[in-house]
């Protein structure tokens, strides 16, 4: 590895880290949900500044509807970051990729509560997809885990 390549790699790594560090995440969640705290910790461990607001279940329904989250894309918590919606247990690496690529979309969702996703760690992790939610409501696989 040349010195120039090493320098460019280090610069890119620092730049990527600074993007995550500057991204502020606002989470709306039910006060009784323990897995949401696990996801919040995961995001913080990956350099995101996170604030959380506990809301009543009926308010969560309103938050999700206003954010463009449907029953097919819903999970337990809804977050706003960088002008996007992040629904559920989406890994920080996918959120960072969303911030880097900036697609014309509503945001990302890990529908349901997939075992093995951030905040849902446990035995028997299951494969799951993170969906990109387009503005017209269509979804496509953004990442598979």
What are these regions (language model features)?
Residues 2-18:
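Bacterial N-terminal signal peptides
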Residues 22-46:
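Local sequence-structure signature of Cys/Sec-based thiol-disulfide redox active-site neighborhoods
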Residues 28-31, 53-55, 89, 111-113:
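Active-site-proximal beta-strand/loop segments in catalytic clefts of secreted hydrolases
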Residues 28-30, 49, 81-86:
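Second-shell loop/turn segments in exported
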Residues 32, 39, 56-59, 91-95:
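Stable alpha-helical elements in mature extracytoplasmic
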Residues 40-58:
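Conserved helix-turn-beta segment immediately C-terminal to the redox Cys motif
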Residues 59-65:
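Structural motif
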Residues 65-145:
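Thiol/selenol-based redox catalytic cores and closely related redox-interacting motifs
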């Amino acid at each position: 590895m040349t010195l120039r390549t090493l320098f460019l790699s280090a610069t890119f790594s620092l730049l990527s880290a600074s993007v995550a560090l500057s991204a502020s995440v606002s989470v709306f969640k039910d006060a009784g949900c323990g897995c949401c705290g696990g996801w919040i910790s995961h995001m913080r461990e990956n350099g995101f500044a996170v604030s959380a607001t506990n809301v009543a279940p009926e308010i969560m329904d309103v938050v999700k509807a206003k954010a463009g989250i449907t029953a097919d894309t819903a999970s337990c918590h809804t977050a706003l970051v960088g002008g996007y919606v992040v629904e559920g247990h989406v890994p920080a690496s996918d959120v960072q990729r969303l911030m880097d690529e900036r697609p014309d979309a509503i945001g990302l969702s890990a529908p349901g509560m997939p075992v093995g996703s951030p905040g849902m760690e446990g035995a028997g992790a299951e494969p799951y997809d993170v969906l990109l939610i387009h503005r017209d409501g269509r979804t496509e696989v953004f990442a598979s885990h």
